[in-house]
Amino acid sequence: MPPRSLSNLSFPTEANESELVPEVWEKDFLPDSDGTTAELVIRCVIPSLYLIIISVGLLGNIMLVKIFLTNSAMRNVPNIFISNLAAGDLLLLLTCVPVDASRYFFDEWVFGKLGCKLIPAIQLTSVGVSVFTLTALSADRYRAIVNPMDMQTSGVLLWTSLKAVGIWVVSVLLAVPEAVFSEVARIGSLDNSSFTACIPYPQTDELHPKIHSVLIFLVYFLIPLVIISIYYYHIAKTLIKSAHNLPGEYNEHTKKQMETRKRLAKIVLVFVGCFVFCWFPNHVLYLYRSFNYKEIDPSLGHMIVTLVARVLSFSNSCVNPFALYLLSESFRKHFNSQLCCGRKSYPERSTSYLLSSSAVRMTSLKSNTKNVVTNSVLLNGHSTKQEIAL
């Protein structure tokens, strides 16, 4: 079946969209299948990028999970959440990315009714796990830095694991409507031909795509981002205030603790920044298409924006391990050891201060006109060996 021109479609291209990665088939942007440069780029370069994303993402996330599972000193609150992020990314890389890549080789939806129900729900579940876990990580950083005395000290790892499971349950439940309403449909063209597509909402009117895109944007992007921003506003305010209240005689000790706090918060903030950077273009594009449901944009610029948004959104599933590699000395050492199949074990009490909110010495500073009282508390639900482990 030759590629179709957008001008021949009698049904809006949004009918092909999945919930977060727009499903406008790139062949619809192309002229006839005559080996043009545009066609070669789309059918060869883009799938190659997908292959790189899958390969790099699998390597990084599998290594990350393996390191956390095989090193007892790495099992703490933030690392449980980070492993949760990696699990969600692996789910997306193993299912949704290959399915999306297949659209560059097939003219129609080839995964049947069951695939049409499962794939959109799986993708939405993965995105939910990512954004809700980032919110939970930010909340953990808030408690560790702003209210360190309120941190739970017993059963913290079990409680955190239950939270991680809860995130998956909520994400799956929120994705159920996607599985219910997604269906395989025949999309007609003005040239009297038709093709099969998986559509995420009923074809009845223009209201469904608008409601769908707005809810997706609010639940999976804007609301979590607002919550995270509030947490980090208070974190920044606390860090700035603590920096001004540091007593001179405790300078070296408190300076090291302050650097620990900043680094812990920085790692989570980098994860959030990567998520926003990778997913924001896709959300904007989906909103634009949903509110211009009957208008088709066949321009080259729109095609490029679509491709970039899609590649960026999937790239988010492979960036977290590399961000952690750059920011965490402990993780970097373990990663290099695993990659080289080495047997060298690194001391658990590293000189680097990294990701252990459940095991970091937090200092509560209270000043008055004559003195400063410094209370150091070891917030650890497991053992002192986790004090500065990743």
UniProtKB/Swiss-Prot annotation:
Residues 66-79, 140-156, 236-266, 328-390 are cytoplasmic. SUPFAM superfamilies: Family A G protein-coupled receptor-like. It is found in: Cell membrane. It comes from the Eukaryota. One of its GO terms (cellular component) is plasma membrane. Disulfide bonds join C116-C198. InterPro entries: Bombsn_rcpt-like, GPCR_Rhodpsn, GPCR_Rhodpsn_7TM, NeuroB_rcpt. A lipid is attached at C341 (S-palmitoyl cysteine). It is a multi-pass membrane protein. Expressed in a subset of neurons of the pre-Botzinger complex. Within the pre-Botzinger complex, there is some overlap with neurons expressing Grpr with some cells expressing only Grpr or Nmbr while some cells express both. Expressed in dorsal root ganglion neurons and mast cells. Expressed in lung. Glycans are attached at N8, N16, N192. Induction: Up-regulated in lung tissue in response to infection with influenza A virus. GO terms for biological process: antiviral innate immune response; negative regulation of interleukin-6 production; positive regulation of interferon-alpha production; positive regulation of osteoclast proliferation; positive regulation of respiratory gaseous exchange; sneeze reflex. Keywords: Cell membrane, Disulfide bond, G-protein coupled receptor, Glycoprotein, Lipoprotein, Membrane, Palmitate, Phosphoprotein, Receptor, Transducer, Transmembrane, Transmembrane helix. Belongs to the G-protein coupled receptor 1 family. This is Neuromedin-B receptor.
